Amino acid sequence: MIASLVSSKEKTSWVTNKVMISYKLDWKKNPSFWNMWAQRSLKQALQLQELNKNVAKNIILFLGDGMGIPTVTAARILKGQLSGQSGEEFQMEMDKFPYVALSKTYNTDAQVPDSAGTATAYLCGVKANEGTLGLSAAAVRSQCNTTQGNEVTSILKWAKDAGKSVGIVTTTRINHATPSAAYAHCADRDWFSDNEMPPEAVDAGCKDIARQLFENIPEIDVIMGGGRKYMFPMDTPDVEYPTEKQHFGTRKDGRNLVREWKERMKEKRAHYVWNKKELLSLNPSKADYILGLFEPSDLPYNLERNKETDPSLTEMVDVALKILKKNPNGFFLLVEGGRIDHGHHDGKAKQALHETVEMDRAIGRAGLLTSTHETLTVVTADHSHVFNFGGYTRRGNNIFGLAPMMSDIDQKPFTSILYGNGPGFKLIDGLRENVSTVDYQQNNYQAQSAVPLRFETHGGEDVAVFSKGPMAHLLHGVQEQNYIPHVMAYAACVGQNHEHCGSSSSSAVSPRPSPATTAISTLAAALTLAWLHC
C-alpha cells in the first residue's frame, strides 16, 4: 500500500497536499500515520546496510557535560515546545544521527564518576581515577609525584601530530575538567593555576592546568571558552570587570600567559579576543589561530547571556569550524556544552535544559558546515545526573510544569521534574514545600529533591553516544567509555591505527535515497506537520 501511495512524484504531491488540506484530522488516532512513520524509519535503516567506510578527514566531538538520557529527552520536549509543538514528537539534531550506542561511564576507582576521569577515558582512550586528567590509573589524585611516567595523550594530540588543525570550544573555563584532558597531565583537576596548587606540588615541578594549555601542545589552532583570570598575574584587574576583585588574575608566578601566547604567535595570523564583537568581526579566511577567553571563569548560562557581549556556543562553533576547515589535512574539534552539568548541580533544571538545547543548535550548525562524507561527528556525555521527570503527565505538558496529580501522602502538588538529591530539598514547618505557592517556572527555580545536599550529584547510569559519518557504525552496542577515541582515531587514521588506511578512502558510502524512499519521507513529514497542527 505504501508503495502505491508514493510510486510517483505526482502521487506524492497529491497526497501531501491532501494531507495539508486535511490537517485538522487527529492523526495520532490514525494507524496510517504510525505505520507510514515506521516505514520511513525502516527505509532509512535499510540504507545503513551500505556503510560509510571513508577515512574521516575531520572529527567533531560534542560533549554534553552531565547530559544523561533523561536530560536529552527533557531537552527534546523543551526544544519542541519552544517551537510551538507539544514536544514529545520533536527531533533534536542529535536524534537524527543514524547510530546510537551506550557508554559505561565509571572511573577506575568510582562507580559514579567525575568529569576528569571520564574525560581522560573518552579523549585519551584509557579509564582513569576520578579527579585526574590525562594520566593513567596509576596516578593518585593530588599526589604530584605520581604524575611523571603515567601521562597518556589525547586524540587532540594524535590529530595535531598527524598534521590536522585542532580546536577546543567550551562554555566552561578552558582549564575545566573536560577540555583539560585534551592537553593536560595533572594529578588534580582543581589545579587551575598555580594559586590553587599546594606549595609542595609547585616545588616538585608539577604544572598548573592553565600553563599546560600553552606549553604541552603549543599551537592549538582554536581555543575558546572562559577562564581569563587564570592566565594573568595575581591582582591584575580584569578587562571586562576591572573593579570586581573576584575576577582579578590569580597567578602567583607573575606570568601573563595571554601576552606570552601573543608574543609567540606574532609571526602567524593569530588573534586574541575577549568579547562577542571581536569574535564575530574576525575574518576566518585571514585567521589561522584564535584564543578567545570570554569570561574570567565560566561563561554565563545561555538564558542569562548578554547577547551583545557574550557569544553563544553556536556562534563560537561557527567561527571555529570556518577557521579549522581551511586545513587540507582536516581537523579535530572538541565542543563542550559544559554548563549543563552546572545547572543540574545547582538543581536548576531550566538552566540545564536550555544549555542542552543550545548545544543541539551548535550540532545543527556544525552539520551545515560539514559533510558526512568526510566528517565523523560524535555526540555524547561524560556522565549523567540524578535528574528525572515523571508523574503521569499528559502529552504537551509544560516540561517545567506540575504533574496532573497530588501526592497521596501529603496531598500537595509536585513538579514533573525532580532530583534524587540536591539543594531543592525544602521543608516548611517540617513539611514538604507546596510548590503551587512558588514560581516554579522561573529560570533559577531549584526543583525539589529527595535528599538534601548543597550540590546535586552525578548519576552512574550509562549515557548515549550518537554518531554519523565515516566509521560511525563502529559506535554500537554497549561499550566502555574509553572505546570512543579509539573509534575516532581509527576513522581518521591517526594515533595507533593505520593498517587499514591504504584502501579505506575509496570505500563506498551510503547511496542516495531512492525516489520511493524520498516520497515516503515527504509524506511522513507532512503527516507529522498536520498532526502537530491538530
Locate the predicted segments by residue.
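Intrinsic disorder/low-complexity segments
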Residues: 1-5, 413, 507, 518
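N-terminal signal peptide
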Residues: 1-19, 529-534
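A post-motif C-terminal structural segment
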Residues: 14-18, 23-41, 52-57, 67-73, ...
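Mobile, glycine-rich extracellular loop/lid and propeptide segments
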Residues: 45-46, 51-75, 122, 127-138, ...
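Short, contiguous strand/loop micro-motifs
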Residues: 141-143
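C-terminal GPI-anchoring signal of eukaryotic secretory precursors
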Residues: 499-521
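Disordered regulatory segments flanking catalytic cores
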Residues: 519-530
